[in-house]
A protein has these predicted regions:
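Extreme N-terminal regulatory/targeting segments of RNA polymerase sigma factors
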Residues: 1-56, 60, 67, 71, ...
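Structural recognition of an alpha-helix C-terminal capping motif at a helix-to-coil junction
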Residues: 54, 58-61, 80-88
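Conserved small/polar residues in nucleotide/adenosyl-binding loops
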Residues: 97-100
Length: 100
């Protein structure tokens, strides 16, 4: 966690820029920062035949997609965009697991 100290004062947008400039440790920090959001969303959903860990994994995939696709020049904050990407990924997983 000591290595995360240098990221604590940075905005999400600055973190994304840092990651895109090659600082791979930033992704660990972002995952740690957003894990509670992912977990709270996983608690409110259900996958037939799955468990909350499956949804948490799907949520983390959504977070990775948010980091990959976020446009720092847009009006939406990264948090808002990540929240949407995480929710969509989880919702899609629920649909795929329950469809015949």
């Amino acid at each position: 966690m000591a290595e995360h100290f240098k990221y604590e004062e940075m905005t999400d947008e600055e973190l994304i820029d840092q990651l895109r400039e090659g600082d791979r440790q930033v992704m660990d920090y972002i995952c740690d920062k957003y894990k509670n959001l992912v977990r709270s969303k996983a608690k409110s959903m259900y996958i037939l035949g799955g468990d909350s860990e499956d949804l948490i994994q799907e949520g983390m995939i959504g977070l990775f997609k948010a980091v990959r696709d976020y446009d720092c020049g847009r009006d939406a904050s990264f948090y808002t965009f990540a929240d949407l990407c995480i929710s969509r990924q989880m919702y899609t997983a629920c649909l795929l697991y329950t469809s015949p």
